[in-house]
Amino acid sequence: MRLPVCLILLGPLIAQGTEEDCPHKKAVTLLPSFTMTPTATESTASPTTSHRPTTTSHGNVTVHTSSGPTTVTHNPATTTSHGNATISHATVSPTTNGTATSPRSSTVGPHPGPPPPSPSPRSKGALGNYTWANGSQPCVQLQAQIQIRILYPIQGGRKAWGISVLNPNKTKVQGGCDGTHPHLSLSFPYGQLTFGFKQDLHQSPSTVYLDYMAVEYNVSFPQAAQWTFMAQNSSLRELQAPLGQSFCCGNASIVLSPAVHLDLLSLRLQAAQLPDKGHFGPCFSCNRDQSLLLPLIIGLVLLGLLTLVLIAFCITRRRQSTYQPL
């Protein structure tokens, strides 16, 4: 025990003497050795998903998907808006390059409805009597066989005339007794006719005439390129008659346009001052009837004069034959 203690006590003295013997040597401090092992730090970036709002469109819908190391973008194939909503559904097919495209959308127009019926054939029993009254007092009365003539286009760029006759049993009457402007409307399957009349109180005698007419008709003529026909004319002065009289004509034709004509057969019309109980006033013949009557009267007069001349000539010859020469 004493020996180790002595060694411990003598240690510093020996070290001090050594320092004095070697003044040029530096002291070295020994540190315990250890090993540093670098630790790899793994950083994992969590993928971030962003959703971009899409807007509903009526055209093609294209969905783009882009994939990267940190960001993934998804465009939903179906988008529904909560306003005036239109829902577009896209069918996406898988691809390998990260882009999916829906097929092109096609817009199909509405299928045309069934064609309107063919024009009605002519019939002798198609004479209709159409009356509109203000209470118990009639103001417009029309009696006629009504037929519509239409010049319609056909295949090949040509045109043809089509004729359709109104059926009185399938025609509804409406109208108005508006002072000096009465009117009459005839509604029938797939069409309508409107007659507008005007009184001329400044003329002597006062008259009433047709000043406006419109027609709208849906009809399927043979090989026709269209079905709907419309025309109107607001500058007419037709079917004119004195107030209190009815306009009478065997065949009155009204031209609404170069392609739409209206024929009124066996016509009798009165649009003002009708007698009670739906009767017509005295008949006023149309110009066509008057133009035929005047040549007939002139012809009969000439024939009568010629007959008188022949009779006078025969009498003169007979008197001359009774005298005998001396």
Swiss-Prot record:
Membrane-spanning segments:
292-316
Whether Manganese counts among this entry's keywords is no
Regions of this protein lying in the Extracellular compartment: 21-291
- Tissue specificity: Expressed in tissue macrophages and to a lesser extent in dendritic cells.
- A Pfam family that the UniProt record links to this protein: Lamp2-like_luminal
Keyword set, alphabetical order: Cell membrane, Disulfide bond, Endosome, Glycoprotein, Lysosome, Membrane, Repeat, Signal, Transmembrane, Transmembrane helix
Stretches the record annotates as Mucin-like: 21-109
Alphabetical list of Gene3D superfamilies matching this protein:
2.40.160.110
Q: Where is this region: Disordered?
A: 38-129
Ranges for the sequence repeats: 44-49, 50-64, 65-72, 73-88
Q: Which residues form the signal peptide?
A: 1-20
List, as start-end ranges, the regions of compositional bias called Pro residues: 111-120
Q: Which residues are glycosylated?
A: 60, 84, 97, 129, 134, 169, 218, 233, 251
Q: Which GO terms describe its biological process?
A: cellular response to lipopolysaccharide; cellular response to nutrient levels; cellular response to oxidised low-density lipoprotein particle stimulus; inflammatory response to antigenic stimulus; negative regulation of dendritic cell antigen processing and presentation
Q: Which GO terms describe its cellular component?
A: endosome membrane; lysosomal membrane; lysosome; plasma membrane
Q: Where is the composition biased (Low complexity)?
A: 38-58, 70-80
PTM per Swiss-Prot/TrEMBL: N- and O-glycosylated.
Keyword Disulfide bond belongs to the record: yes
Cytoplasmic topology: which positions?
Answer: 317-326
Task: Please list the disulfide bridges.
Answer: 139-177, 249-286
Q: What does this protein do?
A: Could play a role in phagocytic activities of tissue macrophages, both in intracellular lysosomal metabolism and extracellular cell-cell and cell-pathogen interactions. Binds to tissue- and organ-specific lectins or selectins, allowing homing of macrophage subsets to particular sites. Rapid recirculation of CD68 from endosomes and lysosomes to the plasma membrane may allow macrophages to crawl over selectin-bearing substrates or other cells.
Q: Which family does it belong to?
A: Belongs to the LAMP family.
- Write the protein's name: Macrosialin
Q: Which organism is it from?
A: Mus musculus (Mouse)
Q: Gene symbol?
A: Cd68
